[in-house]
Amino acid sequence: MLNHSLARLAAACALTIAPLAHAAGPVIDVYKTATCGCCTAWVDHLKSNGFTVKAHNVADPGVIRAKFGISEQYGSCHTGVIGGYAVEGHVPAASIKKLLKEKPKASGIAVPGMPMGSPGMEGPRKEAYNVLLVAKDGSAKPYTSHAGD
């Protein structure tokens, strides 16, 4: 009787826990400074789009950017790392999902600077901007485009 009850309890736990394990989205490590408000807003954007975010406050996110082959010309204020790729700057979650699905041979993707209207930089106006695919040789080309006002 006790074994039968334990088996039912174990089955119930497995049915309860299994959906929770699948609920967590892809994990992205985000390297940012502790005082950057737009970085925190970008982290919130990722979370609201299904990503599990591990935020790390660092003195110089540029060190992480360089480690993953993203040159300063493509830099912004934070760097994410997911699936072996660097995600530099205010990249929309949809572009990250596309990267993970397509798995191009690249160092990562980047939104140089801090375009108004990009995730984490929301405001009354939106600039047009491109998410760049940064190749292993340091070159870059448009990967996704986002319209402005």
Predicted regions and their residues:
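Bacterial N-terminal signal peptides that target proteins for export
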Residues: 1-10
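N-terminal signal peptide c-region/cleavage motif recognized by signal peptidases
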Residues: 18-20
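Local sequence-structure signature of Cys/Sec-based thiol-disulfide redox active-site neighborhoods
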Residues: 23-49
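Short active-site oxyanion
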Residues: 27-28, 51-53, 83-86
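Stable alpha-helical elements in mature extracytoplasmic
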Residues: 35, 42, 57-60, 92-96
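Conserved helix-turn-beta segment immediately C-terminal to the redox Cys motif
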Residues: 43-63
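Thiol/selenol-based redox catalytic cores and closely related redox-interacting motifs
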Residues: 67-149
